[in-house]
Regions:
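Accessory carbohydrate-recognition regions in carbohydrate-active enzymes
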Residues: 24-389, 393-437, 443-499, 507-533, ...
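ATP-dependent phospho-/nucleotidyl transfer catalytic cores
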Residues: 504
Length: 769
């Protein structure tokens, strides 16, 4: 179109629109990410440097060493993150960390710097920290005590730290192998030359799993040869005559000339320099979970030379590409930052495990094997089967395929599908048989390039193995014979176990049917209806059952808040679990007395503050109203309030543990306007999208259209107030009225879906708090 043929005003308007569109598309999406979101309020995320699904993450470690500067200390309470925004005492940068988890692990191999005379006690060389900055792939901080600027960036398997000594003079680089978040101890390190060290540290005992241990190997290269260097080791405390033999007993002993390897629980390596003012010393670190040699290979391959700026640019570019899969328009600045930070958190775990040569530690045995596809680790499946994997299947289906292939490899290597796998070890944390749900959900979405015969074999093992030999379903015999799991011990989580088995068996029924296994499908479908055993007419809730078949008495439905011990339920109470029958919501409603009683009882969960936004069992509750069209306005109101109240552009902006992306995935789906309240069903509950327009770039290997556009269009232009309701949406030329659920094919093949938004829902006008 030629602008000369347009009226002047129209031409100028078009120019402005074109300019705005260009400006928005050219803006870096990494600048919309705030890595400090979730670093307080027990969100347990961290602001360190990492690339999408990278093995390496490097983050500030500030949870030990100073009662004065730290509000929280990892050794004084339950603590599961190497960093919190509430603390201000910096001990160093830890290499390989977990994001959003509830148990401590990894967060070790801590590199730092100091100025002045050498002191290897981290409570002494640690420093107050200030001027923190972070965005995807980069973090920096000022070490106030030493006048050092510390910066970090990362590749998939390596990191590089830059320490700039502003004053110059006596300067030190310190590698602490004793301090860390892990509950395991013991490390070994040796010099390869004056500027390169290699070694390993023992990790594990995650979430009460004492046998789930593994080694993290490392290779560290310093940019400048040190005039003086050596080891340190904390000596045991001695008494009496014995103490006279060692002047360093009970203290850190310095080894300035010894160059063979050294081992111990509290050891480290130091490098001392005389620096010029403003001089920068770089520390390049490679890691592996196979060997020291592979850690060094990863380092020399991914950082063949020293170029901090190039590594940073590559990290930023990788994030920009990953984030640009979803492009949003409109919304507030805070809403955009919340959304893209959630997408950033989604892409941290699971992370790759294989080294550059394809080697990785096999499941259970930790023997070395080689993979042809990306091998993933950190499968927090009780959390992530609900929304993380469905979202990955939509946005990053090739990643999701490799994750399923990894799960099947784990079955071949260890004999079982994973439940909560961590660096090649099964921790058996939480309950259920979640791999079944992930695999079926992936297949139902059309991602089918994996061995379905092997998958079905693996699924059946957990669903049919009797007795104590069943590692995934330890109470299988009761479940199979009774249709439920009785409460045999005071706090044995029996109801939680059974509810997870029901949704797993429903998914297995769906997969069996797709594989042509009709009898199996019928068996598992019958099992999935066993939730009805727990329904108590007296309270209208699910209630634990004793071995004699009677309900637990006395019964306190609200017991279990704030993780207090609770008979029958894990990390929650009866209210948090009683609507968790995602595969049969209409059946549950009938059991509860019909639509009206179901809706009233579900609404009371929110009215009486029995909804827990910080944990998974009731995370889909807001979307259950969409099964009843006249009540769907409640979903729109509640999700709007929850997003506004619990998801904020600040460190406390996640309602609790991010659970390796599960809370972030809830926010992403909710802001997009649809949610998979029953994984495996290919059905979504709808809510009002947050943004004016969202463009999702789909992978055409798996999806018909290259994009899915979601837009909102107000029906009442006269007001600027937030419109949180809709009762119509349009796909193509078809207008849907009073429809609040949509299936996956309809949505993914829509090309464009338009929500017509308004101020008023199914009740008199309600404003958001």
């Amino acid at each position: 179109m030629k602008l000369t043929k347009l009226p002047l005003v129209a031409a100028l308007s078009l120019l402005m629109l074109s300019s705005n569109a260009w400006a928005q598309s050219s803006k870096r999406l990494i600048d919309e990410v705030n890595p400090f979101i979730g670093t307080s309020n027990f969100g347990t995320t961290n602001p360190g440097a990492v690339v999408p699904n990278g093995l390496m993450s490097i983050t500030p470690f500030n949870v030990s060493g100073s009662p004065e500067l730290n509000k929280f200390d990892k050794d004084k309470r339950w603590w599961s993150t190497p960093y919190t925004a509430d603390n201000k005492f910096f001990s160093g940068f830890s290499h390989v960390n977990l994001s959003g988890v509830g148990c401590p692990e990894l967060g070790s191999i801590i590199v730092s710097a100091s100025a002045g005379d050498l002191d290897v006690d981290y409570t002494h060389y640690g420093s107050a920290m200030s001027e923190e900055k972070a965005h995807p792939g980069y973090y920096s901080v000022q070490l106030d005590k030493h006048k050092i600027k510390a910066e970090v960036t990362a590749t998939q398997r390596t990191a590089v730290s830059a320490f700039t000594f502003e004053r110059g003079g006596k300067s030190n680089i310190l590698v602490n192998l004793g301090l860390g978040l892990t509950n395991e101890s013991g490390a070994t390190v040796r010099f390869l030359n004056d500027s390169t060290i290699v070694g390993s540290k023992l990790m594990g005992t995650f979430c009460y799993a004492p046998l789930a241990v593994f080694n993290q190997y490392f290779a560290i290269r310093i940019s400048r040869r040190a005039p003086a260097s050596g080891y340190w080791k904390k000596q045991p405390t001695m008494e009496g005559v014995e103490a006279e033999w060692d002047k360093d007993q009970g203290k850190y002993k310095i080894y300035p000339t010894y160059r063979k390897e050294i081992s111990g629980n509290d050891i480290g390596v130091w490098f001392s320099y005389d620096t010029k003012p403003g001089e920068t010393i770089y520390v390049q670190t490679g890691v592996s979970f196979v060997s020291e040699e592979n850690a060094l290979l990863n380092l020399t391959t991914e950082q063949p030379k020293l170029d901090f700026a190039a590594v940073r640019r590559a990290a930023e570019d990788s994030w920009e590409k990953a984030l640009r899969v979803v492009e949003v328009e409109g919304g507030t600045t805070d809403q955009r930052k919340i959304f893209y930070t959630a997408l950033y958190h989604l892409l941290i775990h699971p992370n790759i495990l294989q080294d550059v040569n394809g080697q990785y530690p096999m499941m259970g045995s930790l023997q070395t094997a080689t993979t042809k596809h990306d091998r993933y680790t950190v499968y927090s499946l009780w959390d992530t089967y609900r929304n993380v994997h469905p979202l990955l299947s939509i946005l990053y289906p090739r990643k999701q395929l490799a994750m399923v292939e990894t799960m099947l490899d784990m079955y071949k290597e260890g004999g079982w599908l994973p439940k909560w796998e961590l660096y090649g070890q099964e921790t058996f944390t939480m309950e259920g048989d979640p791999s079944i749900i992930v695999i079926n959900d992936t297949w139902q979405r059309g991602i089918r390039d994996f061995d379905t015969k092997l998958a079905y074999e693996a699924m059946l093992k957990g669903a049919t193995t009797p007795g104590k030999d069943n590692k995934l379903r330890p109470d299988f015999d009761d479940y199979a014979s009774r249709g439920y799991v009785p409460l045999r011990e005071k706090f044995d989580n029996s109801v939680s176990h059974a509810l997870e088995y029901y949704i797993a068996d429903w998914n297995l029924s769906q997969f069996a049917s797709a594989m042509g296994k009709k009898k199996d499908a019928q068996l598992f479908a019958r099992r999935a209806s066993g939730y009805k055993h727990y329904y108590d007419k007296e309270t209208g809730l699910l209630r634990p059952i004793l071995p004699d078949g009677k309900f637990l008495t006395p019964f306190h439905p609200t017991l279990g808040r704030d993780f207090e011990p609770n008979p029958g339920f894990h990390e929650g109470n009866s209210w948090n679990y009683s609507f968790y029958v995602p595969h049969d919501i209409r059946g549950l409603a009938k059991l509860m007395g019909g639509e009206r009683k179901f809706v009233d009882k579900l609404q009371s969960v929110f009215d009486k503050e029995n909804y827990d936004p910080a944990n998974e069992p009731d995370i889909a509750y807001p979307y259950l109203f969409t099964y009843f069209p006249k009540e769907a306005w409640r979903t729109q109101r509640i999700t709007s309030k929850l997003l506004s109240k619990y998801y904020r552009n600040e460190p406390s902006g996640i309602p609790g543990n991010d659970d390796t992306g599960a809370m972030s995935a809830w926010a992403i789906f909710s802001m997009l306007g649809f949610y998979p309240d029953c994984p495996g069903s290919m059905s979504y509950g709808l809510t009002t999208p947050t943004f004016d327009k969202v463009t999702i770039h789909l992978d055409t290997k798996y999806y018909k259209n290259p994009t899915l556009v979601i837009e909102t269009r107000p029906v009442d232009e006269h007001t600027n107030r937030q419109r949180i309701y809709f009762d119509e949406f349009q796909i193509g030329n078809k207008l849907y009225k009073n429809t609040y659920r949509i299936n996956n094919d309809e949505l993914m093949n829509a090309g464009k879906i338009t929500f017509f938004t308004k101020l008023v829902g199914g009740t008199p006008e309600i404003t958001v708090d």
